[in-house]
Amino acid sequence: MRTILLAFICMMALGSSQAQNQKAERMKLIRSTYAEAKKKVEANGKNGQSPKDMQLVINRLEDEDIPLYDTELLDFYFEEKIVDGLVTKQPPYLIVERWGNHGHLRYREVLIDPNNHKVMFCYMRGETDGGFVVESRYYYDAEGQCIEQKHNTENSWTAPETELENAEYYLKLFNLVNYNGYFTPLDLDKPKKATTPKAERLKHIRALYAKAKEKSAANDRAEMSDDLHITIHDLGDDQPPRTTATRIYFDNEGIYFISRTSKSMMMEGYDEFLFEPKTKDLIFSYTRAAEEGQVYEWRYYYDENGDCIETKTTNTDETDDGFYDKRAAKDLQAIFDLLNGHEE
């Protein structure tokens, strides 16, 4: 009996020793991966290399009567690989969040394993307007289980599970932005609505467009704006760097206008999306593309069912009745909804 007990104790000790060794190896890997990620961020866009990063900035006036202004910045750092002959974005290797509201501050880092794209480490630092600081660090194994956590105070604001949820939220945002036009399906089976005569509909769209342009311009001049900026620097080092800048304008009812600019040494592009205030349906889209001295334009006007009722273009050989624009607009709305916590 004593021999069996001794054997059991030895097995338990051996298992504990192996677990400790595995944890030590994992912690060592996390720290080396973190150091490498920081080096990549520091070198991003330097030494003749194309920058590869994405930033989301959302500005919100929380209350018109009380000046509580909310600003959130999300930086995603990624790499690109050639997959089947195409330059393909990889999931980000590091995500950084900066948030501020009326003196309250928050800073986050999420480290992603560059091999299996799973979360390895999360860091959060929060500070109140009174100067109270909370710091938390979470280390995860390959299965996503927290193997160690460190806090500077007993009253932690976060937990291993909530930080993983935040990381998944950030990754979903990254995918929505970078696969814009291919992610959110269109609802093609919804019941048909009654439509207004074409001439009346076009007049309505043009009037709303003029109002949206005026409103977005006023927002740009405002000290406290309500808008979302998305800036992406990408393309591989064998191609000219490209910058895509998207501005989503919104009010208490939701999105009313979006503009998007894309620039590289080879081409320039510009898009606009106009939404119906009551239903938030896309009612007009515009695209302008300039390449090698040639300029192409497309304008699509939509009825109450999202069907294109008028197309104006300088390139009649390439038109799709706004199908891609509708999908792109749907994804941009999904990004906004996800950021505001009311996704479908």
Q: Which residues does each predicted region cover?
A:
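Sec-dependent N-terminal signal peptides
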Residues: 3-15
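Short, hydrophobic/aromatic-rich segments at coil-to-beta transitions
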Residues: 55, 88-96, 117-123, 226-231, ...
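Amphipathic N-proximal alpha-helical interface segments
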Residues: 69-98, 241-260
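Short, surface-exposed coil-to-beta transition loops
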Residues: 92, 103-108, 122, 131-136, ...
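Beta-turn initiation residues at beta-strand->coil junctions
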Residues: 96-100, 123-126, 150-152, 259-263, ...
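Gly/Pro-enriched, hydrophobic low-complexity segments
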Residues: 108-113, 120, 124-129, 138, ...
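Aromatic-rich beta-strand edge motifs centered on tyrosine
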Residues: 109-114, 135-142, 247-250, 272-277, ...
